[in-house]
Design a protein with these regions (language model features):
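Interhelical loop/hinge segments that connect adjacent transmembrane helices in multipass membrane
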Residues: 131, 174-214, 219, 254-271, ...
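Membrane-water interface segments that mark the loop-to-transmembrane alpha-helix transition
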Residues: 1-11, 36, 45-89, 102-108, ...
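Membrane-proximal transmembrane or re-entrant/amphipathic helices at the cytosolic face
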Residues: 395, 404, 418-468
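Hydrophobic alpha-helical transmembrane segments
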Residues: 101-108, 136-181, 198-200, 206, ...
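Helix-loop junctions and terminal segments of transmembrane helices
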Residues: 46-63, 125-126, 236, 240-284, ...
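Signature of the first transmembrane helix
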Residues: 1-49, 77-88, 110, 140-149, ...
Length: 468
């Protein structure tokens, strides 16, 4: 219950920040922060090296493994903080903006905080005590959101999300340590470290490939179209992809740990995965429809015409958010079943596809080309990832075909109704509200018809189970 409530609150606060921040920050501010976070992400992957995944899976000698993992990650973090100066210098020269250097270095301090948070979080996941991990993490995120908004209103420009991120990490890490019985230890076993790196290296390579796929569009847009144009893309991506993706994160926050615990029981693994798939399909497409249909009302009615370049690419990216969620669910299942090499292959394939098609698409067609290239790449990779997960779990087309067919019918009907109603009104907050209500009404209504009245009943059961 606690995890679900916090996840919902976190999603709402994140959306609130995306409503407010464009009113006080410029596209250039968003672009600078997007690039800084991208380079910080590279450091974060190297510093983590899949250690959390290994800690959740390890069966014996956890205390020794945890101590070694902590020392290993702390040492890497210290080295990477020093390396962040060089990385920041490189970024500032590549993008011809000296303002990138210091934000990257400041964000890198968060690596130390993440080192101390890693083991307490893994301990909670191992015990399936998700609230012990979720409460500190969520409180930290809440603090980060409010700090970012307050700093933006106070005029801190692109520094607002930088300082907000560090504030959130500081609070979250402090609470994780305070609520955990585990305390940092400086024990280090070389043999254990080799085992961690052997498994974690594969996970890290997969994560790095996913990171390249996730941020190659940011890097390309910032380089070829400019940092300010990247700000438009950042907002479009936040609503088009992250909005629906946040829903999958609510499920994936717990699904990997649960699947890891039932990995030896194929029937239970299959059931857990199919349930997650059904719950996600019940809700995520509705969010995607809303963004695709109501992007003009959202951007022009809330942000104003200054942000209008974000509209079309936001609409193109709307389906990507749903696809990313399906890919995340499949990825968790494969990790839990001990098949990280499949994820490694698919992740690098995605990176290769996007690195190949995003630059020429962006150069030729601008932001629209970027969005279309990302949509194509993610579609191919999600299909492969879900296919591998289905094979590993023994799931046939017949198991998911009715769900997919009903979802497609519902999406088309609700999208058509929403477009018809919203097109009759000028772009405004009122049009956004009316359009949203129309889409939700038809979405729920069509699902009810297709399931003969079982959709809401099943949905309420899901919600009740999540909050019980």
């Amino acid at each position: 219950m606690v995890v679900s409530i916090l996840s919902v609150i976190g999603t709402l606060l994140e959306r609130l920040s995306q409503f407010i921040l464009p009113l006080y920050l410029t596209p250039l501010d968003f672009g600078l922060f997007a690039l800084a976070v991208s380079f910080y992400g590279v450091l974060g992957i190297v510093g983590e090296l899949g250690m959390t995944t290994y800690l959740v899976r390890v069966r014996e000698g956890f205390e020794d493994v945890a101590g070694t993992a902590f020392v290993l990650r702390l040492g890497l973090s210290l080295v990477l903080i020093m390396g962040s100066v060089g990385l920041g210098w490189l970024a500032s020269h590549v993008y011809s903006d000296s303002r990138l250097l210091i934000p990257i270095v400041v964000l890198a301090v968060g690596l130390i905080l993440q080192s101390f948070a890693m083991v307490p979080r893994a301990v909670a996941f191992r015990k399936l005590d998700f609230s012990r991990a979720a409460v500190p993490d969520s409180v930290g995120k809440f603090v980060g959101v409010f700090a970012t908004i307050a700093l933006a209103i106070a005029g801190f420009a692109y520094w607002s999300p930088v300082y907000g991120t560090i504030a959130g990490l500081s609070v979250g890490t402090s609470l994780l340590i305070a609520t955990s019985r585990w305390r940092p230890k400086l024990g280090f076993r070389p043999e254990t470290a080799r085992k961690i790196l052997s498994f974690g290296g594969v996970v890290a390579l997969s994560t790095f490939a996913a990171f390249i796929a996730r941020f190659v569009d940011y890097a390309v847009v910032g380089f070829f179209l400019g940092v300010a144009v990247l700000g438009y893309y950042s907002i479009a991506f936040s609503w088009g992809v992250n909005f629906a993706g946040n829903l999958s994160s609510i499920l994936t926050y717990t699904s990997y740990s649960i699947l890891s615990n039932v990995a030896d029981v194929p029937a239970r693994s299959r059931r857990v995965y199919l349930e997650n798939l059904r719950y996600y399909t019940y809700l995520a497409p509705c969010l995607s429809i809303g963004v695709a249909v109501l992007a003009p009302q959202l951007v022009l009615g809330i942000y104003g015409s200054a942000w209008s370049p974000a509209i079309v690419v936001m609409q193109v990216l709307a389906p990507v958010g749903v696809l990313v969620g399906y890919g995340a669910l499949a990825s968790d299942a494969l990790y839990a079943l001990g098949r990280p090499k499949i994820i490694l292959f698919v992740s690098w394939l995605e990176a290769a596809i996007l690195v190949t098609i995003v630059p020429p698409a962006t150069i030729l067609f601008g932001l629209l080309g970027t969005g279309l290239a990302v949509f194509l790449g993610v579609t191919i990779v999600t299909a492969l990832m879900t296919r591998h997960a289905a094979r590993a779990l023994g799931i046939s087309r017949g198991d998911v075909l009715p769900l997919g067919r009903n979802s497609a019918i519902t999406v088309l009907g609700a999208a058509g109704a929403g477009f018809a109603v919203s097109s009759l009104l000028p772009a405004s907050f009122l049009a956004l509200v009316v359009g949203t209500a129309t889409i939700v009404f038809f979405y729920v209504g069509i699902w009810e018809l297709l399931t003969r009245g079982r959709y809401l009943e099943d949905l309420w059961k899901v919600i009740g189970r999540a909050f019980s």
